[in-house]
Amino acid sequence: MADVSNRVHLNPTTAQLVEIALLRGEGQLTANGALVAKTGERTGRSPNDRFIVKEANTEADIEWGKVNRPFDAGKFDALWGRVEAYLADKELFTSELEVGADDEHYIPVRVTTEFAWHQLFARNLFIAPETFNRGNKDTWQIINAPGFVCEPQRDGTNSEAAVILNFAERKVLLAGLKYAGEMKKSMFSVQNFLLPAKGVLPMHCSANVGHDGDTTLFFGLSGTGKTTLSADPKRFLIGDDEHGWAPGGVFNIEGGCYAKCIDLSQKNEPVIWDAIRFGTVLENVVLDEQRVPDYKDTSLTENSRAAYPLEHIAQRKEDNRGAEPHAVVFLTCDVSGVLPPVSVLSKEQAAYHFLSGYTAKVGSTEMGSTSAIQSTFSTCFGAPFFPRPAGVYAELLMKRIESFGSQVYLVNTGWTGGPHGVGKRFDIPTTRAIVDAIVSGELKDVETVYIDKLNLNVPVSVSGVDTALLNPVNTWADKAEYDKYAQQLAQEFSDNFAKYKVSEAIKNAGPNV
């Protein structure tokens, strides 16, 4: 973007941005040194206001529909021009950042924001390189103008706000909304489109590495435990949300973390707790009279967040990279209480459950979501962010698993002993013990028992886990009731999977109806 203002702060520091944000009344300083900001009525993503410009070069490769809504190229250019005109007399903030911790696969991006705290968020979540765009690649542009109000009839938008991706012009436009997560997810969507063409699998997952260099991936929707479980004091964090898996290794797409704060505690999540300090942005977190964050207060939203750079984590992989993963964990939050806490998956089962993406919306990141918990199927454990047809990503996953020999596990962080409201949720220490067993290799050749209805193989024992919890039928007081719920869940899987055109081997890898 050309200099649309003679008051542009180029590559501002954290201290400068915090200072300016406070002076402008954009947020408050908390007792732990973080900057807290509120986003108004939009406290999550706005999927109905997200568009991709329809143009000849990419039109045939995008799966158009409710997730990827088409936008007219002419309308985009007109709207971009209006937003630039709106920003012309404003004090702005611009940083030269990168998306992708990989020399070959990074995207250079110039981020311009109206708000200082949005710029701090971008600098925390993207990568601030020592030398910008060392490979002289074509640079993307992000403009974020929350004060601009779209007019649907004039602009072609769905409401007063819009998030629009334009692959032909390498532009992302955010207008009329304050929720900062839209910035990071927009560039994730861009990488999700571009990477598969290079043979790289983009993933909605977290990743960490052990002292021996063994990498583990954690796939899952918001609230299933990606950030919590990957922030392991015994291992080194690569990243908490977005990664690429190329032949030879895994790399973080980001340079920071965007952790959910609901019920955050120092005891259960010490790594995240310690990362929240000066330089961190707290989004929609309520403060008490002493400016101490109250992470239990959900009066603003269930989707309160902390955005901090990876440098805030002591135990991290400094190059944001790792070897190919020995273990791949699919995190599912089962509200029916039917699935076991851990299952060992075959390659075909891995493909089936990756495409299914069964889980629950727990403190959903979407605008308007309430505390009501409901089951959902989200393809590739991140349907809102993948522009290409699902099969493209599933095929890449199978290719990577087969070529490296990764073992895939399905881990239920949801309920047992009954559905939500009757049973109880697996506690974090139990899930951590399961993950410890996975990363140690204990479960790779473990003895298993077969659960016919679910078509899953379950370990007969896991170190540190009560054996009675491993087979879910044993945790239900009423076995007939369990069978009823299991049958219902199997049918839901089957109904959802009917839309996929895959091999019989993959089709038959799901629950038995």
UniProtKB/Swiss-Prot annotation:
Tagged with keyword Lipoprotein = no
User: Residues that bind ATP, according to the entry?
Assistant: K185, H204, G220, L221, S222, G223, T224, G225, K226, T227, T228, E269, R305, T431
**What reaction(s) does this enzyme catalyze?**
oxaloacetate + ATP = phosphoenolpyruvate + ADP + CO2
Recorded hits in PROSITE patterns, A to Z, give:
PEPCK_ATP (PS00532)
Record: residues binding Mn(2+)? K185, H204, D241
Instruction: Give the highest taxon in the source lineage.
Output: Bacteria
Which UniProt keywords are given for this protein, alphabetically ordered?
Answer: ATP-binding, Cytoplasm, Decarboxylase, Gluconeogenesis, Lyase, Manganese, Metal-binding, Nucleotide-binding
Residues bound to substrate are R45, Y179, K185, R305
Q: Any idea which GO molecular function terms this record carries?
A: ATP binding; metal ion binding; phosphoenolpyruvate carboxykinase (ATP) activity
Q: Which GO terms describe its biological process?
A: gluconeogenesis
Question: Which pathway does the record list?
Answer: Carbohydrate biosynthesis; gluconeogenesis
Any one annotated GO CC term:
cytosol
Q: Does the keyword Metal-binding apply?
A: yes
Stated EC number for the protein is 4.1.1.49
As to how many cofactors bind and how, the note says:
Binds 1 Mn(2+) ion per subunit.
Q: Where in the cell is it found?
A: Cytoplasm
Q: Say which enzyme class the record assigns.
A: lyase
Q: What is this protein for, i.e. what is its function?
A: Involved in the gluconeogenesis. Catalyzes the conversion of oxaloacetate (OAA) to phosphoenolpyruvate (PEP) through direct phosphoryl transfer between the nucleoside triphosphate and OAA.
Family membership: Belongs to the phosphoenolpyruvate carboxykinase (ATP) family.
Q: How does it assemble?
A: Monomer.
Q: What is this protein called?
A: Phosphoenolpyruvate carboxykinase (ATP)
Q: Can you name the source organism?
A: Shewanella frigidimarina (strain NCIMB 400)
Identify the taxonomic lineage of the organism of origin.
Bacteria, Pseudomonadati, Pseudomonadota, Gammaproteobacteria, Alteromonadales
Gene coding for it? pckA
